[in-house]
UniProtKB/Swiss-Prot annotation:
Function: Conjugative DNA transfer (CDT) is the unidirectional transfer of ssDNA plasmid from a donor to a recipient cell. It is the central mechanism by which antibiotic resistance and virulence factors are propagated in bacterial populations. Part of the relaxosome, which facilitates a site- and strand-specific cut in the origin of transfer by TraI, at the nic site. Relaxosome formation requires binding of IHF and TraY to the oriT region, which then facilitates binding of TraI. Upon binding to the oriT region TraY bends DNA 50 to 55 degrees. Also positively regulates tra gene expression.
UniProt-recorded Gene Ontology molecular function terms: DNA binding
Stretches of the chain forming a coiled coil according to its record: none
Superkingdom of origin organism: Bacteria
Swiss-Prot/TrEMBL keywords: Activator, Conjugation, Cytoplasm, DNA-binding, Plasmid, Transcription, Transcription regulation
Chief location of this protein within or outside the cell: cytoplasm
Record text on subunit structure and interactions: Part of the relaxosome, a complex composed of plasmid encoded TraI, TraM, TraY and host-encoded IHF bound to the F plasmid origin of transfer (oriT). Interacts with TraM, probably through its C-terminus.
Gene symbol of the encoding locus: traY
Localization per Swiss-Prot or TrEMBL: Cytoplasm
Protein name: Relaxosome protein TraY
Length: 131
């Protein structure tokens, strides 16, 4: 059964709903990597969208468990990939993102991907000014 929402999916923000036990996996992963929870979730979502463009979910195995919320800001490419994935599945962006982050946390608990990051090679790419 496909679900269709009434809100626009073009925004770059996603409010992620994670079950409490999965959120603890995210906290552990972010502590190991030194990244924030939100950044860790975005990196994992991006990797999952590239690895599994046609993700077959097994269904919501968590039901109505307690959830924690996490707001993620997506870049343009990840947002477009997520919109395409949610259009294929018929789920909303929030559920699509949550299922993918949960699946990635379970399949790849120790995930460190340095290929996603690029070095600042131009002056305008540098975030902080030197003193």
């Amino acid at each position: 059964m496909k679900r269709f929402g009434t809100r626009s999916a073009t925004g770059k923000m996603v409010k992620l709903k994670l079950p409490v036990d999965v959120e603890s996996l995210l906290i552990e992963a972010s502590n190991r990597s030194g990244r924030s929870r939100s950044f860790e979730a975005v990196i994992r979502l991006k990797d999952h969208l590239h690895r599994y463009p046609k993700f077959n979910r097994a269904g919501n195995i968590y039901g109505k468990s307690l959830v924690k919320y996490l707001t993620m800001r997506l870049d343009d490419e990840t947002n477009q990939l997520l919109i395409a994935a949610k259009n294929r599945s018929g789920w909303c962006k929030t559920d699509e993102a949550a299922d993918r982050v949960i699946d990635h946390l379970i399949k790849f608990p120790d995930f460190y991907n340095s290929e996603i990051f690029r070095e600042a090679d131009k002056e305008e790419d540098i975030t902080f000014n030197t003193l």
